Amino acid sequence: RYKEYDLLHAHYGLSGLLATMQLSIPVVITFHGSDVNMKKNYLFSRIASRLSAANIFVHQRLPEKLKIYRGSVNIIPCGFDNNLFFPIAKEEARKTLKWGENTRYIAFSSAFDNKIKNVQLAWSAISGINNCNLIELKGYGKEKINLILNASDLLLVTSLSETGPIIVKEALACNCPIISTNVGDVQRLIKNVRNCYISSYNPDDIKKKISLVFRGNKRTNGEKVIKNFKLENIAYKVIDVYRDTLKNY
């Protein structure tokens, strides 16, 4: 059914470029990272960013890479759904998942076959740790991932590149300890969170930090730190961009 719209919001550079082909209503584009960082997508995104009425970036480095230094640049990271991700007692979550009480479980940030996630580093880091399982976060619904994050001893991120991994925000919302390479906005997110660590790409360094988490055996205060990234708070910021765009169009 035909409807009239006041504004079009596209996600990713290529979709945004297609959206700007019509000239009747303003276009807002959100750039997520892969559309800027990957060579095959860069040109599409750069052109789209010049044709749009406003641009949203999930990380402050993205407009710099597109060489945008003025105009409508809005840094709004992706949010998480606090109705789906929240703390549950680890013992209760493990009981629901039928996990062993005395086994160590480390949640891996993504699918093992995603090369950018660098799972080989994770395997190297946990080698030699007795009774420890690396859990692949692939093929699960949000409810199950919430249980896994609450049941796991920690979330491990060994990525070669990220912009703003949502799984880190979701883990923080579950008070799950995090060990991560210094990618995207992770360092800023966990800066004031206890029992979370930034690691190098040295497996021995990661192993030492895993030992610190295991030895401390405590959850984090991530739920309190991450509250500003709830979906509704992010939505208000996006709506403000819509209003400013329509006012200035």
Please annotate each region the language model reported.
Residues A10-S15:
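Short His-centered aromatic/hydrophobic patch
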Residues K39-K40, F80-T96:
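Acidic anion/phosphate-binding donor-loop and adjacent secondary structure
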Residues S49, L147-S152:
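Short alpha-helical donor nucleotide-sugar binding micro-motif in glycosyltransferases
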Residues G100-K117, W123-I129:
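Conserved donor-binding/catalytic core segment of Leloir-type glycosyltransferases
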Residues L160:
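Aromatic "clamp/platform" in nucleotide-sugar-dependent glycosyltransferases that forms part
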Residues P177-S180:
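Short hydrophobic beta-strand element within catalytic cores of glycosyltransferases
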Residues N192-P203, S211-R215:
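Conserved acidic donor-binding segment of nucleotide-sugar-dependent glycosyltransferases
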Residues Y201, R215-K247:
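A charged, aromatic-enriched C-terminal amphipathic alpha-helix characteristic of glycosyltransferases
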